[in-house]
Amino acid sequence: MNPIVEFCVNNLASGADAAFAKLDADDSLDVIEYDCLTYCDLCATSLFALVDGEVVRGETAEELVANIYTFLEENPF
């Protein structure tokens, strides 16, 4: 089973779309887009994704991708 990375469509529109595209190309991840993840305060202030249910943030799309891979390395399944 692959790790699940979930994105909010509104956060994608705020700049996380580049992170989504990069992660979606990784066959070892299941990357999913949702209409809303109900993290509206977080969504309005930063780029983020849920990685197996845990919030991972980044100031930029590149930082978000790096933080997601770091999270996955530190939390093996």
UniProtKB/Swiss-Prot annotation:
InterPro entries: DUF1450 (IPR009910), UPF0349 (IPR022916). Coiled coil: none annotated. It holds the Pfam family DUF1450. NCBIfam families: PRK13669.1. Belongs to the UPF0349 family. This is UPF0349 protein LMHCC_0204. It comes from Listeria monocytogenes serotype 4a (strain HCC23).
